[in-house]
Structures are given as structure tokens and as C-alpha cells.
A protein has these predicted regions:
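Short, structured secondary-structure boundary patches
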Residues: 1-8, 120-126
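A generic, well-ordered mixed alpha/beta core segment in the N-terminal half of proteins
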Residues: 2-101
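Phosphate/diphosphate-binding glycine-rich loops and adjacent basic-rich segments that engage nucleotide
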Residues: 25-26, 31-37, 42-46, 62, ...
Length: 165
């Protein structure tokens, strides 16, 4: 993640190696001096593309923005899956004044990975506070059952059980 943040913010750093006991991250330019970029990152495993995006989103939003494509896992344990990013997280950011869009060219599941997440970010964002004090009228809870390389019965069973809860 340090390498991803360094890429989008023209930063230098060290200590991201396996077994490191410390981390140094030094931006080399102020945010206003960053130029819009087209970035490609490969996690090289099923590591979470959405966690990488959440790491680099702030420097991209407040800097010059740009596009980012990340390959790795898009649907992982202990990480927000792409649908959460697309349907919950990014819409709230946009309500605050950000201009961010995301697409899922290819899904990648743990343990294989191989997915791709792509985002476009307009930089120089001036975000407003977001106050969520009441549940919006018409709001409802919903769920999506998504599976890969499993018999269809597994997804159907999960769907049936979630309706009973």
C-alpha cells in the first residue's frame, strides 16, 4: 500500500519490505504541485484492490486526480468488495462533492485474484461534511449473493438462509 500511495503522490519511502520494523513515507511535492496521472498497479496476488484504492484515494482527490487501474482481488475476505465501493462508499464521497467513478472490468476472487478495478478521480476536491442523522425515506437493506467456481446450489442456499434471518 505504501508503494501505491507513493506512486500517486510522487513520494519516496522505505520500509515496505516483508519483515520491516518501520515505515518511512515522504511526499516530495505538495498536493497542489502533483500532476494528473494514469496509474497501473498489480498487487501480484489476490490482495485487495479496494483497500489499495482506499489508500490512494485521498492523495488523488486532493491532488491532481487521474485514473488508476489495480489488478488483484476484488472480492476478498476482511476487505470491502467492489459492490460496496460502487454502491455505498463512492456515492457517499460524491454526495460530499467528490467526482469519482469506478468500474469492474474483471472480478477476482480469493485465492486466485486476477481481477481488475478501474477508477477515474477528479482532483482538487473541496469536500463538504456529510451528515447522516436519519435513515433516508425508502431506504432498505438488501444483499447480493455472488460466488465463483462453486456449485449453483451453494449460492441458492445462502440466498434462502439470508431471507430467513
Amino acid at each position: 500500500m505504501r508503494r501505491a500511495a507513493a506512486l500517486v503522490s510522487s513520494a519516496a519511502g522505505r520500509g515496505a519490505e516483508l519483515g520491516s520494523r518501520g515505515l518511512i513515507f515522504e511526499p516530495t511535492l505538495p498536493l497542489e504541485a502533483l500532476v494528473r496521472g494514469v496509474h497501473h498497479l498489480s498487487i501480484g496476488s489476490a490482495g485487495s484492490t479496494t483497500l489499495v484504492l482506499q489508500t490512494v484515494l485521498a492523495p488523488m482527490l486532493f491532488g491532481a486526480g487521474g485514473s488508476l487501474a489495480v489488478t488483484g482481488g476484488t472480492h476478498n475476505k476482511a476487505a470491502p468488495p467492489f459492490p460496496f465501493l460502487e454502491q455505498v462508499f463512492l456515492p457517499r464521497l460524491c454526495e460530499m462533492g467528490a467526482t469519482v467513478s469506478a468500474t469492474l472490468p474483471r472480478a477476482g476472487f480469493y485465492p486466485a485474484g486476477g481481477g481488475e478495478l478501474a477508477v477515474e478521480v477528479e482532483g482538487r476536491a473541496a469536500l463538504r461534511p456529510l451528515q447522516l442523522m436519519e435513515r433516508p425515506e425508502g431506504a432498505r437493506a438488501r444483499g447480493v449473493v455472488l460466488s465463483a467456481n462453486l456449485p449453483p446450489g451453494v449460492a441458492h442456499r445462502e440466498q434462502r438462509r439470508s431471507r430467513l434471518s
